[in-house]
């Protein structure tokens, strides 16, 4: 994000990293409590464990926030919604525009093929901590919503094991971790006679950095509230 921000004309005032990894020509602090600089907003790719400190900093300084971290609990989501009553927050599980379109296509296919069996497989590098990925959960949500509109009840099944028959409406979600794979998400719809697969593969994290910078430019001009990729894509950024 730092390199792409500089290349796109966005000045990075400082960074926050408890381990202070990497080399930058701006200050890097181990805590938000140490930050002295003023900025137009914050871009966050970190961990759910940093949420409380992050929200406290942004709210107390009236700073817009791009929240691109995944793995939040329901309690975390409630905290984010409460903070969004005070500041503008852009929250998404994936900042890539192509992933956004991937999810939209999934919803359309799920609606048209509501009687097909659906399975989701996500693959990431061996250092990714949360499973399933936020994007895989977004894929399930897209399928579930599209099918509920047709009166079909869906249920997520995380990693199949044991002896059990697949139930109608089940959506399997499977996670693979290995090597340095940036990220791949595949959704397949099966019938007795055919199948259709929709896949998104990320080859570089530049994809997500550019999307986060677009989200930053978008959110700093907004009033308080909770925003998503739907809002950003409507602006044709």
Question: Model features per residue range: what roles?
Answer:
Residues 1-33, 39, 114-237:
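C-terminal substrate-binding/catalytic lobe of Rossmann-fold NAD(P)-dependent oxidoreductases
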Residues 5, 35, 54-58:
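Generic structural signal for hydrophobic
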Residues 12, 28, 65-66, 89:
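Hydrophobic beta-strand scaffold residues
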Residues 42-43:
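N-terminal Rossmann-like NAD(P) cofactor-binding module of classical short-chain dehydrogenase/reductase
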Residues 46:
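Conserved NAD(P)H cofactor-binding loop of Rossmann-fold oxidoreductase domains
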Residues 49-56, 60-61, 68-90, 97-100, ...:
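Rossmann-fold NAD(P)-binding glycine/threonine-rich loop
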Residues 83-92, 191-198:
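Glycine/charged-rich beta-loop-alpha catalytic/anionic-binding loops adjacent to active sites
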Residues 91-99, 125-132:
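Short, surface-exposed loop/turn motifs that are enriched in glycine and acidic residues
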């Amino acid at each position: 994000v730092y390199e792409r921000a500089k290349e796109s004309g966005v000045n990075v005032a400082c960074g926050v990293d408890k381990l202070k990894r990497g080399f930058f020509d701006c200050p890097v602090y181990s805590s938000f409590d140490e930050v002295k600089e003023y900025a137009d907003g914050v871009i966050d790719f970190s961990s759910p464990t940093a949420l409380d400190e992050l929200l406290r900093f942004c709210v107390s300084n009236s700073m817009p926030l791009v929240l691109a971290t995944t793995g939040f609990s329901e309690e975390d989501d409630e905290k984010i919604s409460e903070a969004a009553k005070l500041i503008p927050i852009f929250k998404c599980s994936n900042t890539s525009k192509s992933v956004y379109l991937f999810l939209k296509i999934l919803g359309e296919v799920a609606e048209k093929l509501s009687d097909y069996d659906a399975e989701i497989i996500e693959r990431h590098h061996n250092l990714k901590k949360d499973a399933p990925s936020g994007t895989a959960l977004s894929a399930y949500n897209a399928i579930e919503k599209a099918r509920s509109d047709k009166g079909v009840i869906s249920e997520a099944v995380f990693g199949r094991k044991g002896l059990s028959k697949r139930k109608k409406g089940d959506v399997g979600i499977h996670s693979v971790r290995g090597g340095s794979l940036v990220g791949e998400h595949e959704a397949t719809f099966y019938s007795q006679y055919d199948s259709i697969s929709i896949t998104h593969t990320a080859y570089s994290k530049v994809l997500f950095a550019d999307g986060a910078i677009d989200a930053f430019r978008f959110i700093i001009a907004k009033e308080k509230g909770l925003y998503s990729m739907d809002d950003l894509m409507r602006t044709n950024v």
